[in-house]
Amino acid sequence: MEKSKKKKKEENKEEDTIRTYEYMKWNKFQKVHGPEYGLYHFQVPTPQQRKESFDCSGETTLFSKSISHEYTKFYKPMKAPGPNDWLMNHKEYGQTFREYSRFGFHEITRKKKVIYIAPLSFNINPAFDQSFLTAMIILAQDYYYDMIVKLLNINIDLSGVEYRNYEDGSYQLNANTIIEKLFNEMPDDGYCLVCLTDIDLYNNVRVIKPRKWIYYPPPYKNDFCYELNSFKYWVSICSICRFDPLYVVNNPPDDDDMHIKMYFSLLKRSAKLVLKNIGHMFGLKNCIFFKCLMNGFGSMEEFDGRPMEICPCCLRKIFTNISRKFNRLDDNGRVENDKLIYDRFKKIKESLDKNFAGIFEVESKWYQERIESLYLELFIGNKNEELNYDK
């Protein structure tokens, strides 16, 4: 009996050693700490690593200059995260443009070229339902230029989806089981499908962690997820349940101005979440080089601190992918049309001012400054000027 216990103890010790070894592998930017520091300690990328992430050195085309020009002014570098931030608690390897081109590419084809946005159990104020969804379509169309964006009405039987009930009458759905059902709703011409829901979600996948650092508590209401993506089926589901101010304050405000302000807040957050998930469907992973729309987040405060625009690294990934489909690459695989980024920024700025006046004021100002800077550089300045990455 004692021998069997001793043998079992040795096996458990060996198993923990193997798990710890696998779990404590270093990557370029993270190393493992104990729970008193957060699970991971993020090492901020150096200026050289940020420059190499979008890999424009040595290129003299206006396209490469429009990506990298004054990038230190318009794109803030990623800073050291706090103890509760995403990068301190999740393992992120990052993804350079070169890595994306080799391993993460989700190719656009003639048969699959439509981005679908599908609402699921939408219970927002009926007066805003159609306008809310239309806003998502307009922003996605402007943001991912040349792509076709359509609204897809789906009817998923939620009776077979795993869920949790709570004493206050609320419930959560298992995002993994919904992902499996979404794949069957994808049209034949669908490049990707992003499902937007007002239902609270949770993700029941557990990561193997050393036993001395973690315990598995019973399910509780704050165990939730904002989004879940499948790179196998190219479908995504994102929940705006906790973006709604009424999630915290159950009683709707009597003041009409306050009601409109709350709706604008919900619209802005939802738009950022939808655009981010479409970016994931292009094969982009969470960005770790700059403050970027594609940064991972674990709380609403962290999400609100993220910009609406993607960084130079992610921007080049998107442009190269779309340009490959529309024959805009030269013999070296580089984008030929030098005005693409300028035209995209200008189109987004005009759309924000025309369709969303008063909602995206900060973003509109950023785009205006970016457009003016690019105009001076691309059309007035010296086109053959060497890029300075050492600012």
What are these regions (language model features)?
Residues M1-D198, L329-K391:
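N-terminal low-structure segments adjacent to metalloprotease catalytic domains
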Residues K111, Q130-F290:
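Metzincin-family zinc-dependent endopeptidase catalytic domain
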Residues N123, Y202, F319:
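Surface-exposed, flexible loop/turn segments at secondary-structure boundaries
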Residues Y233-K261, S265-R269, K285-K391:
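Metalloprotease/metallohydrolase-associated module, dominated by Zn2+-dependent proteases
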